[in-house]
Protein backbone atom coordinates (compact mmCIF):
# COMPACT_ATOMS: atom_id res chain seq x y z
CA UNK A 1 0.00 0.00 0.00
CA UNK A 2 2.93 2.30 0.64
CA UNK A 3 4.00 2.00 -3.00
CA UNK A 4 0.49 2.80 -4.20
CA UNK A 5 0.25 5.86 -1.96
CA UNK A 6 3.72 7.00 -3.01
CA UNK A 7 2.64 6.73 -6.65
CA UNK A 8 -0.69 8.47 -6.13
CA UNK A 9 0.58 11.35 -4.00
CA UNK A 10 2.58 13.05 -6.80
CA UNK A 11 -0.27 12.48 -9.25
CA UNK A 12 -2.80 13.97 -6.84
CA UNK A 13 -0.54 16.92 -6.09
CA UNK A 14 0.09 17.54 -9.78
CA UNK A 15 -3.62 17.25 -10.52
CA UNK A 16 -4.53 19.55 -7.62
CA UNK A 17 -1.93 22.11 -8.70
CA UNK A 18 -2.57 21.67 -12.40
CA UNK A 19 -6.35 22.09 -12.37
CA UNK A 20 -6.38 25.43 -10.48
CA UNK A 21 -3.43 26.62 -12.58
CA UNK A 22 -5.37 25.93 -15.79
CA UNK A 23 -8.40 27.77 -14.42
CA UNK A 24 -6.25 30.71 -13.35
CA UNK A 25 -4.55 30.85 -16.75
CA UNK A 26 -7.92 30.76 -18.51
CA UNK A 27 -9.23 33.54 -16.26
CA UNK A 28 -6.14 35.69 -16.83
CA UNK A 29 -6.31 35.08 -20.58
CA UNK A 30 -9.98 36.02 -20.68
CA UNK A 31 -9.31 39.12 -18.58
CA UNK A 32 -6.53 40.25 -20.91
CA UNK A 33 -8.67 39.61 -23.96
From Swiss-Prot:
Family: Belongs to the MSDIN fungal toxin family.
Prodomain positions: 1-10, 21-33
Post-translational modification: Processed by the macrocyclase-peptidase enzyme POPB to yield a toxic cyclic decapeptide. POPB first removes 10 residues from the N-terminus. Conformational trapping of the remaining peptide forces the enzyme to release this intermediate rather than proceed to macrocyclization. The enzyme rebinds the remaining peptide in a different conformation and catalyzes macrocyclization of the N-terminal 10 residues.
GO molecular function term, any single one: toxin activity
Provenance organism: Amanita phalloides
Keyword Lyase (UniProt): no
Cross-link Cyclopeptide (Leu-Pro) per UniProt, renumbered positions: 11-20
Organismal lineage: Eukaryota, Fungi, Dikarya, Basidiomycota, Agaricomycotina
InterPro entries: Amanitin/phalloidin (IPR027582)
UniProt KW keywords: Toxin
Protein name in UniProt: MSDIN-like toxin proprotein 6
UniProt function note: Probable toxin that belongs to the MSDIN-like toxin family responsible for a large number of food poisoning cases and deaths.
